[in-house]
Regions:
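Subset of outer-membrane beta-barrel
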Residues: 20-375
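Cleavable N-terminal export/targeting peptides
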Residues: 1-29
Length: 375
């Protein structure tokens, strides 16, 4: 029998790089700080948040390697994945020795699925090599993510077996892999310090859709009906800084893209995403506030838009260990408000291991991890 536990589903999307990319940035430091990053990201993770930050580095920074950053978010508010798995097991047992109790329990599970909100899963992977210089900072990177939405469609048949067999799950997914180079440089303009960044990038966009019976549903089969599109895009970034104080603007995916699905006539819209940030990035503490100026559209036919306000804080113990916390709010109310936290370990300022998690209520959680080397 197919086991589709939350842990297995989460692992699938972290370990499937062929299906990755888009608005979700895999970065454990950012994740621990409420997914902020427009002014608080470092030169190594700048392409994930604001390419201008590649120019803001320390004098002893010569090269950085991010290998890799991974992350996953799962939103299964009504435990739909577990209910599907339980219903599949229970139906198999009913086929052998049906009992009124088993049929009643199967109906209860179907009722639970009928009332459940769609399951949403995001997963990401990022890699980067950064070489900062006073002439031009360069960051070669690859990043990607997949986001999946699964919604049960339960039959209204009065016969338990017929109701189960006639029920279905509708699944839609979007994936994108990006390969790019982030270029940035600092300037002094009118006695004020600025940094500008640009990221030309190549994108591989993919959509997946399917409608399958509840009995045959397996979330690992999300990529059975693939439509792909290759395209060019660009990110832009601006940062102002004075000592430890910063303000910034990031514009992701300057050129709007859309890609249709093979089934169901869905269209995924990858729209420009503008975010502003302000913060303080010091030696021992960092504070950041990011606010989306635009909505993230996603599937045109679905009410799945998001627009976030995020806050984060980091305490740094002499460059050897970090403690982080944050909070994010979706102004569109499609995702619940989330509390985040994380830790970092960076002995000798050469190896950095970052771990982070988020929580937004029962069955709504996320996790991320980074491994980086700086020389």
């Amino acid at each position: 029998m197919r086991k589709i536990t939350l842990a297995a589903a989460g692992a699938l999307f972290v370990l499937s790089p062929h299906a990755f990319s888009a608005p979700y940035a895999a970065d454990a430091r950012s994740h621990g700080m409420g997914n902020t990053g427009v002014v608080s990201a470092d030169y190594l993770t700048a392409p994930l948040h604001n390419p201008a930050l590649g120019a803001l580095y320390r004098e002893n920074d010569d090269i950085g390697l991010l290998i890799p950053a991974v992350g996953v978010n799962i939103h299964d508010e009504d435990e739909a994945l577990s209910a599907v798995d339980d219903a599949q097991d229970l139906y198999d047992s009913i086929q052998g020795i049906p009992t009124p109790a088993n049929e009643a329990e199967l109906n209860r599970l179907l009722d639970q699925l009928d009332k459940s909100v769609p399951v949403v899963i995001n997963g990401g992977l990022s890699l980067a090599i950064a070489i900062p210089t006073r002439y031009m900072s360069v960051n070669l990177f690859s990043t990607g993510y997949v986001e999946i939405l699964a919604a049960p469609d339960i039959s209204d048949s009065t016969n338990t077996a017929d109701r189960y067999l006639n029920s279905a799950v509708n699944l839609a997914a979007f994936g994108n892999v990006e390969y790019g180079i982030a270029l940035s440089r600092a300037y002094t303009i009118g006695e004020q310090q600025f940094a500008f960044g640009i990221t030309p990038k190549y994108q591989q966009l993919k959509t997946y859709t399917q409608r399958t019976t509840l009995d045959d549903f397996d979330i690992e089969d999300y990529d059975k009906s693939e439509v792909s599109k290759n395209t060019f895009n660009m990110d832009l970034g601006l940062a102002w800084y004075h000592n430890a104080f910063r303000a910034g603007l990031s514009l992701k995916d300057v050129f709007e893209q859309d890609i249709e699905t093979k089934l169901g006539n869905y269209t995924y819209e990858l729209t420009p995403q503008a975010t502003v940030g302000i913060g303080y990035v010091g030696n021992y503490v960092a504070l950041s506030l990011d606010a989306d100026l635009t909505k993230q559209k996603r599937f045109k036919e679905l009410d799945d838009d998001t627009q976030f306000i995020r806050v984060g804080i980091e305490g740094n113990a002499w460059g050897w260990a970090q403690l982080r916390a944050g909070y994010e709010i979706d102004l569109e109310n499609n995702l619940d408000n989330s509390v985040t936290g994380g830790i970092g370990i960076s002995p000798f300022d050469v190896i950095s291991l970052d771990l982070a998690g988020s929580y937004a209520g029962d069955n709504q959680f996320g996790a991320a991890a980074n491994l980086a080397f700086t020389f």
